[in-house]
Curated annotation (Swiss-Prot):
Its main location: cytoplasm. Pfam families: eRF1_1 (PF03463), eRF1_2 (PF03464), eRF1_3 (PF03465). This is Eukaryotic peptide chain release factor subunit 1. The modification Phosphothreonine is found at residue 347. Changing residue 63 to A/R: Loss of hydroxylation. A motif (NIKS motif) lies at residues 61-64. The keyword Ion transport does not apply. Keywords: Acetylation, Cytoplasm, Hydroxylation, Isopeptide bond, Methylation, Nonsense-mediated mRNA decay, Phosphoprotein, Protein biosynthesis, Ubl conjugation. The modification 4-hydroxylysine is found at residue 63. The modification N5-methylglutamine is found at residue 185. GO terms for cellular component: cytoplasm; cytosol; cytosolic ribosome; translation release factor complex. Transmembrane segments: none annotated. One of its GO terms (biological process) is regulation of translational termination.
Length: 437
């Protein structure tokens, strides 16, 4: 995950788009004054400008005065945004403009335009009471998806792994006769029945695989991993009943000691090299490397907001690791009496304590200059500190441990740093303040 800085930057871009989608999906407006415009890479700005001029003419006929004015206002905003571009950027252009209604019931104008992190091959123009983000969501879900078939003597499980998400698509159990010494003339008949049931089982698995992993005549996964404890997986991979299109996608056969969901987890673990570009594995590796630094006590690690920010300021952080749902806010306050700026990092619990926002001596309230989630601030500023930012989930065991045990924020350092020996002036202040340093 960290070996390729461009991949890490791309992950930050993906996180930003996920965050944007979340806020756009939640936004609602009155009437149809919210415009979603997506221009694919090879389109012409002039064509879109003409289309908008035509739309402006059509919108002038809307009967409701309020709706007419807000739609015309939104179209004008989009036209203004387009004037900033001579041509469509290489990856296309996404524009959202309109008036939304906030939770307090106030109206607020939204104007967003950006080039996505990879080509968006969708053309879209919609006026509605909400923003349409389906094309952006599709852009994110284009990560490689891998199929897993876990097959043993007691049943089969079909699943997929995409990015950090694993999903069980289907599973069924089977009751196959065991080999036994019941004998005499019946031995051959028993063996024949066994082979027949086994054959039918493999056929059922092969047919189910086609239903799940082939859609519209095409294989819908980037690769397949066959896993199992007996030789069923080998039998399936070599069987004539197994669809040729799927056969060509088999990446690996994996021996596992369990069936079902435990087997699925084990199969993911054992296919690591094959799926090394899947984020789930990369995340485990990255946090594993972080834990190694800690267990070997190399001193090349930091955790918690305070130490991590100290290390960033020193330029010591090579990889900054942050949990995607980190709920710490960064506040920049202006102290009225001293005219100094103060920076606080507070959890939702600490935010409730209003004493953080007032002067201890005078009781005067500090002026709020800026507030934003700390992760968002990192996403905008990590390059200034020469670090790579990795945004992780708590879906893997390591990720969950990182969030619960280390607060979801830490870093792998370029060199050993002794945080104990770096006492701050005003060490009694429990909040880390960059200006004190």
């Amino acid at each position: 995950m960290a070996d390729d800085p461009s991949a890490a930057d791309r992950n930050v871009e993906i996180w930003k788009i996920k965050k944007l989608i979340k806020s756009l999906e939640a936004a609602r407006g009155n009437g149809t004054s919210m415009i979603s415009l997506i221009i694919p890479p090879k389109d012409q700005i002039s064509r879109v400008a003409k289309m908008l001029a035509d739309e402006f003419g059509t919108a002038s006929n809307i009967k409701s005065r309020v709706n007419r004015l807000s739609v015309l206002g939104a179209i004008t905003s989009v036209q203004q945004r387009l004037k900033l571009y001579n041509k469509v950027p290489p990856n296309g252009l996404v524009v959202y403009c309109g008036t939304i209604v906030t939770e307090e019931g106030k109206e607020k104008k939204v104007n967003i335009d950006f080039e996505p992190f990879k080509p968006i091959n969708t053309s879209l123009y919609l006026c509605d009471n909400k923003f349409h983000t389906e094309a952006l969501t599709a852009l994110l879900s284009d990560d490689s998806k891998f199929g897993f078939i876990v097959i043993d003597g007691s049943g089969a499980l079909f699943g997929t792994l995409q990015g950090n998400t694993r999903e069980v698509l289907h599973k069924f159990t089977v009751d196959l006769p065991k080999k036994h010494g019941r004998g005499g003339q019946s031995a051959l008949r028993f063996a024949r029945l066994r082979m027949e049931k086994r054959h039918n089982y493999v056929r059922k698995v092969a047919e189910t695989a086609v239903q799940l992993f082939i859609s519209g005549d095409k294989v819908n996964v980037a690769g397949l991993v066959l896993a199992g404890s007996a030789d069923f997986k080998t039998e399936l991979s070599q069987s004539d009943m197994f669809d040729q299109r799927l056969q060509s996608k088999v990446l690996k056969l994996v021996d596992i000691s369990y069936g079902g969901e435990n087997g699925f987890n084990q199969a993911i673990e054992l296919s690591t090299e094959v799926l090394s570009n899947v984020k789930f594995i990369q995340e485990k590796k990255l946090i594993g490397r972080y834990f190694d630094e800690i267990s070997q006590d190399t001193g090349k690690y930091c955790f918690g907001v305070e130490d991590t920010l100290k290390a960033l300021e020193m330029g010591a952080v090579e990889i900054l690791i942050v949990y995607e749902n980190l709920d710490i806010m960064r506040y920049v306050l202006h102290c009225q009496g001293t005219e100094e700026e103060k920076i606080l990092y507070l959890t939702p619990e600490q935010e409730k304590d209003k004493s953080h926002f007032t002067d201890k001596e005078t009781g005067q309230e500090h002026e709020l200059i800026e507030s934003m989630p700390l992760l968002e601030w990192f996403a905008n500023n990590y390059k200034k500190f020469g670090a790579t930012l990795e945004i992780v989930t708590d879906k893997s065991q390591e990720g969950s441990q990182f969030v619960k045990g280390f607060g979801g924020i830490g870093g792998i350092l370029r060199y050993r740093v002794d945080f104990q020996g770096m006492e701050y002036q005003g060490g009694d202040d429990e909040f880390f303040d960059l200006d004190d340093y």
